[in-house]
Amino acid sequence: SLHGRVGTIPARLSGYGTRWEGDRAFLWAEGVVTQAAVFGEHLELTRRIEVEVGSDEIRMTDEVTNRGFYKTPHMYCYHINVGHPVLEDGARYIAPIRDVVWAAHADSYDGQGVGYRALPGPQTDFHEQVWQHEMGTDAEGEVPVALVNDRLGLGLMATTRKDQFPCLYEWQNLQAGQYALGIEPSTHHVLGNGAARDRGEMIWLTHGQ
């Protein structure tokens, strides 16, 4: 599959409920996805989603554990895709960008003329663009990235830790009918498995890790 089998495996609901901190109520749900194969990996993803009642923040915590007995490679990338109405002509990509370190669309960029900060409306015959940015962090080591629509007063911000997700990509698919922008924090470069191994950057999980 395009991004690994885990994306098409149903989760098993392992719990849900309400927890309290003083007079603050938090709703939570937790699920487990198991990806396993004979002579292959046995990985378990535990995801917890939590929201404080009355807030506009959703907190998601993922933990991947190797339940098998083979040393197993581990790569992780989120695809946080935002579309209309937040994404429209004039929407802004806001992030603590220090530098552009890689782009996947050098052959088409000059003709398309779309940069990484200000977004146009839906395009015809648009070829997807992917930017990798070197990001700064706040005092807690976090990287806040947002897509903001000033006209509507709407936006979405995703915050991750740079020590957990050192790579961050902006995916632009501005083609009419598929119009979306992806905020994509990743443990590795999107060149994939082979590149991570060749560079000595692959994360390996042993049993119980």
Predicted feature descriptions by range:
Residues 33-80, 206-209:
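Acidic, contiguous internal or C-terminal segments within carbohydrate-active enzymes
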Residues 151-209:
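Active-site pocket scaffolds in enzymes
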Residues 9, 30, 140-141, 154, ...:
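Membrane engagement elements in two modes
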Residues 83-84, 88-160:
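Active-site/ligand-binding surface loops and adjacent short beta/alpha elements
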Residues 2-54:
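Extended, loop-rich substrate-binding clefts of extracytoplasmic carbohydrate-active enzymes
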Residues 76, 82, 88, 199-206:
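Targeting-peptide/extracellular-domain and disordered-appendage signature
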Residues 18-25, 51-55, 86, 174-178, ...:
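A short, structured loop/turn motif at beta-sheet edges
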Residues 24-28, 44-46, 57-59, 142-144, ...:
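Intrinsic-disorder/low-complexity, polar/charged segments enriched in Ser/Thr/Lys/Arg/Asp/Glu/Gln
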